[in-house]
């Protein structure tokens, strides 16, 4: 079938709006009509050429919502007409990782997904007879996409797709990191480095967890109003100080902050976040994705004296079983999604959405099909 899509033909170049061909779903696959998709920093990261798994030409997009159109052989968990959110972190329930109960990092389709292919090692997308790669198992920058069954969460059909599409990545990642990875407790102190969608979601999650002091940190003070709305008690612009941000935080509490979250992908900030964590028990959670080949460093004594360095992917959330409940929470108002959507646009305007992101003028732009 034909589908309008925003295709990245090469790194560092604007997306091109073209009509592509989408092949029918094969065994274990599902064809979806995407209704809405967020434009995420991860899409921009891959488009920049810095992503070690980036392949081109590719249909980007991984933060979407849509409706099932057709199912392939053997698909039983969804049917045509079901409302779904595609998952870049699949959940088969059968692999060693899923059976362990210790992680949300399923490996059922990970190997082929990282190569931009469907589980059988081929692609369902083509343009003028030439294959196009998939992206993170989702490719929501196409009006129609094909996704593995294990990479779909079935959701309440009454949910507002313009808002709940954000649960496909950024908001779930931030809120989940608070509850599942850090396990923030009432009264704990929290510092959030970077106030994009993920960082703001961490702030909201910290408020849900009844954290005591919630410190929001960003060099763009325009982010502070929304951070306070979500629950920040303090907002800090590192550029306002003539000393490292670590020292600013240690002035607040000389022993450090209970939980710090790096939501940028800057290895220097990752170190600062760890070294701002509380001596004896503080933990720092890395959420941001650093560029290809970059490494983190610190003095081992930082860990010897009780600090813990952790990472979090998709907030530790198991998408197929847990994401539908988060959609219900959003519908009840327990998760506030609307403020994240600062702009809505058509697919034809998608490059403007990337410009707004790079200029720091948006939190999330949602594309409506």
UniProtKB/Swiss-Prot annotation:
Q: Which SMART domains has this protein been placed in?
A: PKS_ER (SM00829)
**Per the UniProt entry, what are the Gene Ontology biological process annotations, in alphabetical order?**
formaldehyde catabolic process
The record's catalysed reaction(s) read:
S-(hydroxymethyl)glutathione + NADP(+) = S-formylglutathione + NADPH + H(+); S-(hydroxymethyl)glutathione + NAD(+) = S-formylglutathione + NADH + H(+); a primary alcohol + NAD(+) = an aldehyde + NADH + H(+); a secondary alcohol + NAD(+) = a ketone + NADH + H(+)
Name the coenzymes or cofactors required: Zn(2+)
Ordered alphabetically, the record's keywords are: Cytoplasm, Metal-binding, NAD, Oxidoreductase, Zinc
Please give the PROSITE patterns that the UniProt record associates with this protein. ADH_ZINC (PS00059)
Q: Which Pfam families match?
A: ADH_N (PF08240), ADH_zinc_N (PF00107)
One molecular function GO term is: zinc ion binding
A single GO cellular-component term on record: cytosol
Identify the main location.
Answer: cytoplasm
Please state where this protein is localized. Cytoplasm
- Residues binding Zn(2+) 2 are 92, 95, 98, 106
Q: Which residues bind Zn(2+) 1?
A: 40, 62, 169
Explain how, and how many, cofactor molecules are bound.
Binds 2 Zn(2+) ions per subunit.
Keyword Cytoplasm found: yes
Q: Which residues form the signal peptide?
A: none
The UniProt record lists the EC number as 1.1.1.284, 1.1.1.1, 1.1.1.-
According to the record's subunit comment, the protein's assembly and interactions are: Homodimer.
Q: Which NCBIfam families does this UniProt record tie to the protein? A: adh_III_F_hyde
Please state which protein family the record places this protein in: Belongs to the zinc-containing alcohol dehydrogenase family. Class-III subfamily.
| The protein's name | S-(hydroxymethyl)glutathione dehydrogenase
Taxonomic source organism: Escherichia coli O6:H1 (strain CFT073 / ATCC 700928 / UPEC)
Q: Provide the organism lineage as a comma list.
A: Bacteria, Pseudomonadati, Pseudomonadota, Gammaproteobacteria, Enterobacterales
- Its gene name is frmA
């Amino acid at each position: 079938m034909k589908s309008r899509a925003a295709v990245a033909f090469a790194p560092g170049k604007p997306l091109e709006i073209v009509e592509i061909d989408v092949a029918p779903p094969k065994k274990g696959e599902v064809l979806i009509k995407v209704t809405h998709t967020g434009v995420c920093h991860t899409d921009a990261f891959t488009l920049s050429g810095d992503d070690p798994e980036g392949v081109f030409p590719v249909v980007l997009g991984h933060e979407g919502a849509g409706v099932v159109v057709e199912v392939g052989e053997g698909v039983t968990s969804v049917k045509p007409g079901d409302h779904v959110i595609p998952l870049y972190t699949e959940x088969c329930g059968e692999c060693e990782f899923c059976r362990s109960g210790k992680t949300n990092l399923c490996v059922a389709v990970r190997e082929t997904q990282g190569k931009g292919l469907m589980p059988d090692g081929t692609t369902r997308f083509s343009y003028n007879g030439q294959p196009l790669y998939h992206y993170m198992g989702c490719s929501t920058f196409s009006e129609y996409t094909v996704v593995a069954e294990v990479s779909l969460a079935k959701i309440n059909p009454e949910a507002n797709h313009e808002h709940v599409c954000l649960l496909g990545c950024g908001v779930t990642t931030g809120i989940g990191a608070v509850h599942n990875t850090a396990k923030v407790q009432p009264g704990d102190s929290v510092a959030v480095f970077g106030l994009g969608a993920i960082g703001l979601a961490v702030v909201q999650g910290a408020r849900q967890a009844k954290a005591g002091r919630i410190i929001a940190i960003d060099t763009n003070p325009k982010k502070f109003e929304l951070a306070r709305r979500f629950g920040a008690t303090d907002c800090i612009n590192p550029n306002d100080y003539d000393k490292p941000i670590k020292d600013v935080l240690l002035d607040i509490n000389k022993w450090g902050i209970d939980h710090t979250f790096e939501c940028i992908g800057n290895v220097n900030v990752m170190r600062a976040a760890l070294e701002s964590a509380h001596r004896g028990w503080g933990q720092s959670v890395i959420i941001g994705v650093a560029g290809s080949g970059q490494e983190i460093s610190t003095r081992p004594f930082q860990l010897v004296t009780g600090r813990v360095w952790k990472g979090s992917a998709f907030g530790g959330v198991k998408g197929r079983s847990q994401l539908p409940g988060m959609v219900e929470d959003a519908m009840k108002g327990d998760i506030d999604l609307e403020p994240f959507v600062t702009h809505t646009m058509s697919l034809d305007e998608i490059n403007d959405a990337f410009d707004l992101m790079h200029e720091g003028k948006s939190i999330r732009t949602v594309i409506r099909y």
